[in-house]
Amino acid sequence: MFRVHCNKCFRHRKTDPAVPFHLTQCRHVICGPCLGQSSLEKNCPLCGQVLKAIQINRDMPTSVANYFADPLRFQQIYRKISKFQADQRASDNLGFYRQLQQLEQNKRQLEGFCKMEAQLNQKVVEEKKRIAELRTYIAYHENAQRMTRRRHSAGERFHTPEFKEAWNTSISTSDKSPSDMPSDSSRRSADLDTQSTRRRSFGSDTKGFRL
């Protein structure tokens, strides 16, 4: 801690406690008598800047009173502040690092999911192709079975009593059909042949026969 004194006449506050001391805006300490001499010029007697001062007492603002406080106290506060802010920066960096790790993990999982999706899509395509082939195979064999059942059903109808009866009826009817019966022209030809035969037989026996 320093001793408060006038920076112009070097008067100490402890020596003349009744004399007021002032702190200028340019950070100089000036006693009341020296300040009175400079107030007419309105300039700091040490640096010549515009004079603007505040009296040093217990009613000073905190921002001004801190210039007269023990610097060790501020050093301790500074250490605490520095440690607090350093811890906060470390915590922020740790959070950022963990977020980065989580991001990398999510990226790997996403790549794995994308690969799995591609494999599943390929599997779906293969299964659809396999299903189409199976449907074609099933349709082919169902059609073959239907054709086989039709042939088998047709073969069984030939051996039923109704089919045999109908078959025999058709045969007997065809035997007696007009095509098998002698026609009129055939009968005429037969009669003519018979008459000529008779003539020939009678002509040979009755030659010279007279009534």
Curated annotation (Swiss-Prot):
A zinc finger (RING-type) spans 6-47. Residues 149-211 are annotated as: Disordered. Residues 153-165 have a biased composition (Basic and acidic residues). GO terms for biological process: homologous chromosome pairing at meiosis; positive regulation of meiotic DNA double-strand break formation; reciprocal meiotic recombination. Pfam families: zf-RING_5 (PF14634). This is RING finger protein narya. May interact with itself, with nenya and vilya through its RING-type zinc finger. Required for the formation of DNA double-strand breaks (DSBs) together with nenya and vilya during the meiotic recombination process. Plays a role in DSBs processing into crossovers. Plays a redundant role with nenya in chromosome segregation during female meiosis. Nenya, narya and vilya contain a RING-type zinc finger domain and are named after the Three Rings of Power given by the elves of Eregion in J.R.R. Tolkien's books. It is found in: Chromosome. Keywords: Chromosome, Chromosome partition, Meiosis, Metal-binding, Zinc, Zinc-finger. Expressed in nurse cell and pro-oocytes (at protein level). One of its GO terms (molecular function) is zinc ion binding. It comes from Drosophila melanogaster (Fruit fly). Gene3D superfamilies: Zinc/RING finger domain, C3HC4 (zinc finger) (3.30.40.10). One of its GO terms (cellular component) is synaptonemal complex. Residues 172-184 have a biased composition (Low complexity). It comes from the Eukaryota.
